[in-house]
Amino acid sequence: MKPEAHIEDIEFVPDRSLSLETGRIAKQADGSVVARLGDTMVLSTATLSDSVNESNFFPLTVDYREKFAAGGKVPGGFIKREGRPTDKETLTSRLIDRAIRPLFPDGFYHDVHVVNFVISAGQDFDADVIAGVGSSAALMLSGAPFAGPFAEVRVGRVDGDYIVNPTMQQTEESDIDLVVAGKEDALVMVEGEAEEISEESMIEALDVAHRSIRRLCEGQHRLVEQAGEPDPFEWEADRVPEQLVQRMREEYGPKVADHIHGPYSKETFHGGIGDLKDQAVDDVLGDASETPEGYTASDIRDAIGEVEKGEMRNMIVEEGKRIDGRDQTDVRDLWMEVGYLPRVHGSAIFTRGETQVLGSITLGTSDDVQPVDEVFADTDKSFYLHYRFPPFSVGEASYLRGPKRREIGHSMLAERALRPVIPEQDEFPYTIRINADVMESNGSSSMASVCAGSLALMDAGVPIEKPVAGIAMGLVQEDDETTVLTDILGQEDHLGDMDFKLTGTRDGITACQMDMKIEGLSRDVMLKALKQSRDARHHILDRMEETIAEPRAELSSHAPRLTKLTIDPDRIGAVIGPGGKVVKSVQEETNTEITVEEEEGVGIVTIAATNQRDAEAAIERIKQIVAVPEEGEDYVGTVKGIRDFGAFVEIMPEKTGLLHVSEIDYDYVENVEDYLEVGDKVKVHLLEVHDDGKMRLTRKPFVSEENGEQNE
């Protein structure tokens, strides 16, 4: 029997609707929804565990996967099955996770798993924001203690007009690409990139997004009404007992306050708080494992942590001071240096307080592009940034593994920040890779990576239009008091209510990422944070320009020199040769790297050399290969083979003609080897080129009839 499906069509902008369907598939999940926009469909499910996770954080897992079959494609490579998540899948999972996480209550420690499968991939709309709406609707139907709904939309701007959920073609033409998540009354997450837009334009984009978000949230409420309200999930909050927090505040609050107001460094701050926790455990427990009330050492430590949080937030709101002595708008001390690494193509150290990033540049050829094989796009990236956060940067002893979700997310954020100033390929035909290695971290290492990357690009001589800087903004909201913080420390990020990262040039914003720990952010606070970040960004740019004012005029001596030649596309095969034989031989002879490709009906040969002499040698060889022999012209060739009927003479690379025995001399030639040997240089005249490319040569014009010798 066909199950009954409940469908809600939501017109989020005039003449464009997103549909939500439940009850047809995946009914054993606690909540399941199929979200559809155009031909793109996403199955979103939400499942909750009955048991409590032993961790002391909310165990939320969000997965987003694009099935190649959804787009009528088969995965590339030897294994024809989807493997580990792609970067895009990881980034989309993070987008949804960051919107969901602040909407669950403190003390909820049951595992929550949200899964999104792209089951149909249309040609017009990407699936990422559709999955966000589906995830929210699935949670609404699951009975979870979820303070939703929320909705995600993409905002673009083409020719000055804002577009909600633009087509992929419109996104390509847009100067803004923002993903915005929010509830009916506030925004909870923002991420995206832009081409140096103003703070006012950013606010306009967010306003446009929020109008559609409200409609999508209202539609989710209607879907739940159709399907029936789910039974609420039964759970008990696992919070630090308020009586214990109050006791610790009375007994240790003054000590915590004194420590917070004292001299600051990351090590002394955390060490001192740790000592106070140890002291409290010893004082309260002694040799016992728990108190008569059942409080354990873990409970006592958590209670001191709550006291610390309260004291730090009160200090910020009431005194206008922060734990390191700065006021709300101060940027930490800066120092930076370029050219630190002698062998790389460009390098920079950027240090802000106790956060430090070493950036390095590698310039490569088109062989070094990053191929991207995805359901919605097959592209090649000629600019990419890799962020790495080794454990020693925070004083930890741990294992080095592959990139984690956070590292992939920070890599993309920094890459987006710099992308608008990267020159076009026709101006600077290099593949550019940035390594951003965190050396020390005490907050905002991704923004330090943007600054280090910008400095390193200029040190490498990459002709970027202007430098880019980044800053992380924070928020502390207590009752009616709201304080926006510039350049937040790690502890301010941990105990605060917002992490809002913004990057840009002097002329505007290039990228942003906002995460909330409370249920949302008002428009006025958002505008204040944007304007405050602009002042900080300009301050950092001033210091960066003191270090290096503009890109170096010359590339590093270790960087490849790229030269591009255009050739007839019909000659590409001649340059490459059978099995790559010809191009490999040219590379070996000239100590260069050569790539050959066709673009828009034109053959493009790119030569990478470390010096001008090698480049010129390779250029000459390529020109010889692609040159076309002309009838009536004279050539100096090399004898490649001898037969009874004549000799084969190579007059150009890979172009050999027949010098018939009758054309070697005016006299009768009985034995060709009496006149020519393999390897001899011989001057010939091209008599004829046949339709099949075969050439007929003669030596007679250069032979004296009297002595039978070739004239010089």
From Swiss-Prot:
Top-level EC class as recorded in UniProt: transferase
The record's Pfam families line, in alphabetical order, gives: KH_1, PNPase, RNase_PH, RNase_PH_C, S1
The entry's localization annotation reads: Cytoplasm
The enzyme's E.C. designation:
2.7.7.8
Needed cofactors? Mg(2+)
Keyword vocabulary terms for this entry: Cytoplasm, Magnesium, Metal-binding, Nucleotidyltransferase, RNA-binding, Transferase
Q: Which residues form the S1 motif domain?
A: 632-700
Q: Which domain of life is it from?
A: Bacteria
> From the Swiss-Prot or TrEMBL record, what is one GO molecular function term?
polyribonucleotide nucleotidyltransferase activity
* SMART domains reported in the protein's UniProt record: KH, S1
**Purpose of the protein:** Involved in mRNA degradation. Catalyzes the phosphorolysis of single-stranded polyribonucleotides processively in the 3'- to 5'-direction.
The identity of this protein, by name, is Polyribonucleotide nucleotidyltransferase
